[in-house]
Amino acid sequence: PLAMAAIDMLIDVLSRSRERFARALDGVTVEQANTQPTPELAPRVDSLTWLCWHTARELDTQVSALAGTETVWATRGHRERFALPLPDDTEDWRHTPEEAAQVVVSDLGALVAYLDDAYALATAYLHALTPQVLDDVVDTSWAPPVTRAVRLASVIDDAAQHSGQAVYTRRLLGLPG
């Protein structure tokens, strides 16, 4: 059926963005990952760390809300591992360049672990869906109201956008790929 094909397509598109993040992080040092590559010329070109963290955060918060579960940020110890100097409810999509620069890691393993957990959460959620629930309204604060399918497409599109930005950021750092 067409609706099941839509779920399979969402899973495929989501997995492609994770593969791009893996390529963007391949061989990168912690210092390179934490660097905003063009802070004076283009301060909104964020670091690899911020792009990965933000994407994981969006997948985590949006899918957890849809699933009615706590975030993996809270339940898998990521909050403690990152120990960011930002409020736990920081609206990362509204970060200034100065706030984005505060998202740094001392261990790339922590960053990759959060990405992996967020992608695993989203993928498991998608696999568990039935086509009948895609048209369920999940947010009435928008006009028109947002369906489950639209919310999922939005967060997966965000992941695709930021994974592409991560590859570009890698190149701005002078790294191949």
Which residues fall in each region the model found?
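Short, Lys/Arg-enriched N-terminal segments with co-localized hydrophobic residues
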Residues: 1-4
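Short Lys/Arg-rich basic patches
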Residues: 6-10
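A generic structural signal for well-ordered alpha-helical segments enriched in polar/charged residues
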Residues: 19, 23, 27, 61, ...
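Acidic/histidine-rich alpha-helical segments that form the ligand environment
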Residues: 85-135, 153
